[in-house]
Structure formats: C-alpha cells, structure tokens
C-alpha cells in the first residue's frame, strides 16, 4: 500500500504521476527524451541502462518494467537483458556497453565515483561524449525515479506477465503521461 492516497492498483510511477500531473508530466517527458530521443545508443541499450540502475537500486517495479521494454526492443536478442542483469562481466554485449554500464553503476552509487579513467575507458571502446553524457543522465534520472517510486511505496505487481505486457507497450508507445 502506498504511503499516500493514490489510485489503487495503478502500478509504479504511473500512480504517482496521476496523483500530481504537474510534476509527473515533465518526468515522463524526460524519460521520453532519454529513452526514445535521438541517440547513437539504441532504445534497447538505453532501456537496459535504466533496468541495470534500477536493479542496483533494488527497485523491482522499474527494473522489471524497463527490463521487459529492453527485451521487447532487443527482439531475438532479448536474452542479453537477463545476461547483463545476472552477470554483466560475462554478458554478450560490446565492451563499449560494458564500459557505459560501469559508469552507470558508479552514478547509481554516487556521481563523484565516476573517474576520468572510467570515461577514458568508455571512449577507448568507441563511446562518444554524447553517449557518455546520456548514460550518466539516464543513470541519474533512474536513481531519482527509483527513489520516487520506493519512497512513496507505490504498488509493485508481482506477476511477471504484467511486466512483459508493460514492456511491450513501453517499447511501442514510449512515454506519455497518463491523462
């Protein structure tokens, strides 16, 4: 049960955005730009960053929904998502993506944990400054989203099938604030 009076049964951040649309709308707009806007990182990769940070923050709703969206976007390569979430070191992703996820993981702990060596390592693997920037911003934004969802104890479904449907919808439609 949520700590505040939100609509019963509406999961995660959606119930909080419905409670306070004037603050929720900009959050959805930020998610849309970060996860669906123009980027050389694929939408699947950006959703994976969101899921990875959410897992590290132990925010089940965000981890499950964004992992499902990433799986939907990866299509036939959807096993990549679970491989990363279970064991990033042995996951079948590029060294560039591993370097970017390393940065995201450090941002999740504390932004100041990211070192010049981390950035140089990502660049050495082919990451652009925009990709590094966007990785840091996705990690920072999802750390905030995770704290928002958990801090108000929003409803978290336990049925994995709900997340798969949610992920497909997010992959197809992106992020629009509820009306």
Give the predicted meaning of each segment.
Residues 1-179:
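Hydrophobic alpha-helical segments
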């Amino acid at each position: 049960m949520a700590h505040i009076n939100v609509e019963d049964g509406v999961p995660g951040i959606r119930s909080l955005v419905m409670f306070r649309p004037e603050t929720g709308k900009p959050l959805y707009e930020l998610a849309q730009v970060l996860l669906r806007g123009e980027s050389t990182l694929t939408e699947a990769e950006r959703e994976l960053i969101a899921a990875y940070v959410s897992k590290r923050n132990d925010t089940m709703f965000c981890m499950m929904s964004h992992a499902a969206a990433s799986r939907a976007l990866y299509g036939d390569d959807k096993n990549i998502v679970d491989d990363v979430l279970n064991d990033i070191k042995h996951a079948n992703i590029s060294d560039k993506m591993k370097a970017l996820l390393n940065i995201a993981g450090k941002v999740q702990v504390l932004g100041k944990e990211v070192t010049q060596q981390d950035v140089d390592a990502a660049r050495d693997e082919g990451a652009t400054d925009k990709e590094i920037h966007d990785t840091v911003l996705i990690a920072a934004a999802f750390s905030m989203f995770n704290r928002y969802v958990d801090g108000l104890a929003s409803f978290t479904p336990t049925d994995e099938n709900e997340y798969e449907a949610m992920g497909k919808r997010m992959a197809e439609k992106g992020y629009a604030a509820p009306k």
